[in-house]
Amino acid sequence: MGHYAPDGAYPEGIGYWDYGTSFNAMFLSAIEKAFGTDYGLSELPGFLKTGEYILHAVTPNLKNFAYSDNGGTAFLAPTMFWFYDKTKDASILYNQVQLYKKDGQKRIKKNRLAPAMLIWGASASLANPQIPARLSWKAQGDNPVCFMRSSWNDSSA
């Protein structure tokens, strides 16, 4: 989990983030359910901040900031609901709600972890997604990144 330090950026882009982080979230959920604690693993440097990495890596027109060998199409990431559950930051789900509104049924059918959204997002209100306050985000780490935008809901921003 050291790759998330110090600020939550992931070295290989958001496709690999989704793959690796989804297993982290499932493991942390399982041990927390079994033992009542995740033994501080979610508190490791950068981990709880990494949801912001994905939030900011998706553009207002629902494309990915594509680097490494990742594609440019944004995708539904059920793991973002785990980050919502842990942080109670409703804005972390902003892009997920937009993606679902665009073509959610198609996206859910293709996602192996879609049922986890029901568990991790049980307390989320998705009817009126909270627009994130920050228009920029930067992170150091294995592959430093900086994302900037002028708006969350203007597709040309």
Question: Where on the chain are the PLM-derived regions?
Answer:
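Acidic/His metal-coordination segments adjacent to aromatic residues that form catalytic metal sites
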Residues: 1-13
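Carbohydrate-active enzyme catalytic cores, enriched for enzymes
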Residues: 16-157
